[in-house]
Amino acid sequence: MPTTHYDTPRIVLIRSRKVGLINRAVQLAILAYVIGWVFLWEKGYQETDSVVSSVTTKVKGVTVTNTSTLGTRIWDVADYVIPPQEKNAVFIMTNMIFTLNQSQGHCPELPDDNTECNNNSSCVPGYVSTHSNGIQTGACIPYNSSIKTCEVFAWCPVEDDNHIPKPAFLQAAENFTILVKNNIWYPKFNFSKRNILPTFSSTYLKNCIYDAQTDPFCPIFRLGKIVEAAGQNFQEMAVEGGVMGLQINWDCNLDRAASHCVPRYSFRRLDNKDSANTVSPGYNFRFAKYYKESSGIETRTLIKAYGIRLDIIVFGKAGKFDVIPTMINIGSGLALFGVATVLCDIVVLYCMKKRYYYREKKYKYVEDYELVGLLG
């Protein structure tokens, strides 16, 4: 018998061993994925639920200012927290522009390209622009000794907000404290908890201040430390205001004791601070305090308030063992083992150097005359 007849079985045997090794390697990779990723990392054996949350806040702090406009004045919570309550947020005023003793009447508009004039023909009666403080009367009157502007019917004198106080009016606001009370509920598991943990005593709660290292679960935060933890400078931010985010993460594994389900706090600045884009930076709004004089004339104090808005963002997911997701993931994992054969075939049919040997054994090619004989 010619020796060439013995070569093919030997080569096929070598191919079969390599195919078996590849097949086992693919199966081990799938097994590692199912056990390591699906069950251990992603906890595929658990049913999950999203958090339902409520938040209330309480700010404390007192400071004093002494200015030529207001004199010596005490500022407490009722003065600088506006409004007193918001949904999942709190605003603390840190800087302001006062326009005192405004009353409705006629006065010159602030000078700009659209309001400066030389005579009455430059002013249009009834004209109102986007940035107007009032309605033009059609008269051109002196704003000061060198400039004339169009007269308006408005709250007079009109506000001049071209110069923001620096440093911030309430510099001491960085020492104000905020108590954040957060109650959470996972309805699917009927599990509820709050961020004032059961281990806290009244004495501890009165004296603790949040610190990531020493007091990571204290729900009382110093405003300056919140800004600092987000990588910002409080005194700079206090001038024009900004929006901060206090994030509370409640990721809980309910297969463990309830004491392990605790909040994790993090901080970041939410409004974009870009040194290259200085148009309309920070956060501000206007409000007024109204008075009526004995003569019956209504007056007001207009305040343009700059400050830090703190948004409290609560998120989280809880998981607990359940038979249904466990069986679904086990079944999916077993089904993946069927992929091992397909992947193995792809490797040996298209990637290996001697792939034609495997193809010869996997597929049987029938000649035309053999096919005719079979059909006949």
Give the location of each predicted region.
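Membrane-proximal extracellular juxtamembrane segment immediately upstream
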Residues: 262-376
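Membrane-anchoring signal-anchor transmembrane alpha-helices and their immediate flanking context
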Residues: 1-79, 331, 338-363, 367-376
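An acidic- and aromatic-residue-enriched active-site/binding cleft used to recognize and process polar
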Residues: 17, 255, 315
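Eukaryote-biased feature marking scaffold/signaling PDZ-domain proteins and nuclear chromatin regulators
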Residues: 9, 16, 20, 241, ...
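Hydrophobic alpha-helical segments with strong N-terminal bias
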Residues: 7, 11, 26, 229, ...
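Long, solvent-exposed, non-transmembrane segments immediately flanking or lying between transmembrane helices
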Residues: 28, 32, 36-268
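Eukaryotic intrinsically disordered and solvent-exposed regulatory patches
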Residues: 21, 234-236, 294-297
